[in-house]
């Protein structure tokens, strides 16, 4: 009997180790996969990297569709059109230790340019930006902006946001003016607040166009409704 119990315990240990390894490999593959996608690629390419989405939505009348993925360290949002071409994707961090690279953006550190990552303030990414929207409800605060990349980013928009479904890299700061905020209010907010979300638009895209049809980053209530939050 003692031998049998020991054998069961050993098998359980092996299974736990295998589960940990498989989860680690899956997570590592997902994180590495972020550097393998961009707008303009096929949605099938995205599925080949990340697998089937945990949630999908379709706005058939507008010709755009959304896949949502949830991994240990981040949410991934992918928007594509009727031609199966990705027109937008965003990453929202779920872990303050997870600081993914931001496409097209570099910082000058120690006499050299290095890839920018999440974990810095809005102002550190760009001295100026274009305000999109911000809101404050009884449940959450959010904020979103974009910068136009021009030639270095192949004429795309790069989006940043504080998404309430994501992690707080720094103490939450509330924008004092949320409807048509003044430049003074924006500057004060951007100096101390940190985005937890970045998004990449399509070539020659419009911030009022298909690329933001589903918003920027996973919807707060959609995130709360995922199976991972049930138990």
Regions found by a protein language model. Give the residues of each.
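Non-cytosolic coordination micro-motifs
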Residues: 91-231
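Hydrophobic, helix-forming membrane-interacting segments
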Residues: 1-20
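Intrinsically disordered, low-complexity N-terminal regions enriched in serine/proline/glycine
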Residues: 12, 20-23, 68, 202, ...
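Short N-terminal edge-element motif at the start of the domain
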Residues: 19-110
């Amino acid at each position: 009997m003692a031998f049998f119990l020991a054998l069961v315990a050993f098998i359980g240990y092996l299974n736990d180790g295998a589960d940990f390894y498989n989860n680690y490999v899956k997570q590592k593959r997902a994180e590495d996969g972020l550097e393998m996608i961009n707008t303009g690629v096929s949605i099938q390419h995205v599925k080949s990297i990340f697998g089937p989405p945990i949630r999908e939505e379709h706005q058939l009348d507008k010709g755009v569709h959304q896949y949502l993925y949830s991994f240990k360290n981040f949410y991934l949002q992918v928007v594509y059109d009727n031609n199966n071409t990705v027109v937008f994707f965003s990453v929202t961090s779920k872990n303050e230790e997870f600081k993914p690279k931001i496409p097209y953006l570099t910082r000058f550190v120690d006499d050299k340019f290095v890839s920018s990552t999440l974990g810095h303030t809005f102002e550190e990414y760009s001295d100026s930006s274009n305000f999109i929207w911000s809101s404050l409800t009884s449940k959450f605060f959010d904020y979103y902006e974009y910068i136009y990349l021009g030639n270095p980013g192949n004429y795309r928009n790069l989006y940043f946001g504080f998404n309430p479904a994501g992690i707080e890299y720094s103490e939450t700061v509330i924008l004092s003016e949320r409807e048509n905020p003044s430049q003074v209010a924006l500057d004060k907010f951007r100096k101390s607040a940190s985005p937890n979300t970045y998004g990449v638009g399509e070539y020659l895209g419009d911030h009022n166009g298909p690329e933001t049809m589903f918003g920027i980053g996973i919807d707060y209530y959609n995130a709360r409704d995922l199976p991972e939050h049930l138990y």
